[in-house]
């Protein structure tokens, strides 16, 4: 890949291929403009060069192209692979909404239906891993709903599990736990879970019971084993013992729960929420690495 001196970067520059900080981490997607804050980050992190396999796009060649930011986004995600990822992401998000609707109506799907869905997500990752990651980091704009959050957390948990060299059946269990980790929120009264203002102490205690409800949904209603239920129940526990619902700590927290916790935290940072904008993937990772909790 070519080396581009950081000092030569200017806001608004665009390239025909992504700009990389190193061999794996993208700082700017292909055909997206370099932002002043991107340059500031690179300098703050004391990076001297970035890398790309592409060429700088001549601004004059784009003068006649309308579309603004949305046009740039559309162009950046217009490859055949990204179009397929976008189509399947939308389809799978809707399937999760259907799962959650059925759970809410006390008509939970069975474990075989969930397993079949996870197989489809695993196939998507196997075929388009890099494009899926790009979509989670850059392709979704606007607030994410519970289904999209669940899909993102499931994909990220699978990717972490694969990097940990988990066996195939363990990856399936991990994915099911991640997918259903917050299903227990559907057992919390809507007036509490949808409340916009600050929660009262009693309401907060109610919210903190949702992992237990998730465990019961997973094991009693859907029919998964404890290997799927326990990580979902433990995903809000923390290494220092300050999590919930049982305040367990350290290695007493299952590995799968720890993986889901990391994926969940990262997903929350890169997804837009009503009270804040999404972070970039790099900022989210650096925030997590700097969080001692």
Q: Which residue stretches match the model-derived regions?
A:
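Membrane-cytosol interface segments
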Residues: 1-113
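Acidic/His-rich, divalent-metal-binding segments that scaffold phosphate/diphosphate chemistry
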Residues: 66-208, 215-227
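Histidine/acidic-rich helix-loop-helix segments that form or flank divalent-metal centers
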Residues: 178, 218-221, 225-257, 275-276, ...
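Active-site-flanking alpha-helical
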Residues: 188-189, 241, 271
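Conserved beta-strand-loop-short alpha-helix elements that form
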Residues: 258-271
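Active-site neighborhoods and metal-handling regions in enzymes and metal-associated proteins
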Residues: 210, 270, 274, 293
